[in-house]
């Protein structure tokens, strides 16, 4: 039987991706974050930090983008505490949001 070479951080990233997508679609009520799609989640090997890559279906001006970033920073704590309740992990990783620009590079 061939061994599957998956790192634990990859499996946890997939789980966090699924949960964060659910949280954004059902629990986040901030209108600044409407149209956000979670593209992928990456974790550091020590699993202390997670990077959540997002894209938005809305086209933003600089002012709107600033509001989006403010909304994301305000929802970080809520997402982390919700993940802490749902996932059986010793420590819930620090959350960092990054815009996924690869969607626009085509």
Task: Write out the residue ranges for each language-model feature.
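Charge-rich, low-complexity N-terminal segments
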Residues: 1-49, 55-106
């Amino acid at each position: 039987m061939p061994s599957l070479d998956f790192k634990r951080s990859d499996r946890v990233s997939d789980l966090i991706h699924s949960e964060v997508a659910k949280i954004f679609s059902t629990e986040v009520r901030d209108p600044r974050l409407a149209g956000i799609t979670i593209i992928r989640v990456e974790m550091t090997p020590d699993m202390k930090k997670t990077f959540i890559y997002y894209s938005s279906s809305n086209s933003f001006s600089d002012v709107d983008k600033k509001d989006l970033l403010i909304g994301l920073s305000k929802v970080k704590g809520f997402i982390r505490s919700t993940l802490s309740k749902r996932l059986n992990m010793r420590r819930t990783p620090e959350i960092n949001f990054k815009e996924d620009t690869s969607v626009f590079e085509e």
